[in-house]
Amino acid sequence: EYYAGKYNIDPLILYSFIRTESNFNPNAQSNVGARGLMQITEETFDWIKLKIAPSEDLTFDDLYDPETNIRFGTYFVSYCLLRYHDDLATAAAAYHSGWGTVDNLLSQAEYSSDGETLDHYPYPQMRLYVRKITNSYQRYQDIYNEK
């Protein structure tokens, strides 16, 4: 929740990403080598490190540390949300498939009516991922708003 506050993100959004990416397993590793709670790839780790921790002696293996992983993952989610105008679904698509893919889709009227948010997802894996994130977020909102 510290990093949610630091980057001004609803913590429930972060829970949704962590649940979807690793089911809260800090030692998770994907078949493409993404690591930790928020399943960050080495390329993404290197990019984020330049942005938020250039002088820190961190390695890709440090992503197995929950605090480091959440710190880096939260920055990445916040960047995606900022880039895509706080639209969670489009930001989730970018987190999953990359900005290049999403930016390309945004330029096509069949996928985006406004050029800023995605209306449709052409790839089944992207569509499933976005649905998992948005459904998890809705469930967390329902649970925590009942209290």
Spans of features found by a protein language model:
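Catalytic glycan-binding domains that act on GlcNAc-containing polysaccharides
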Residues: 1-147
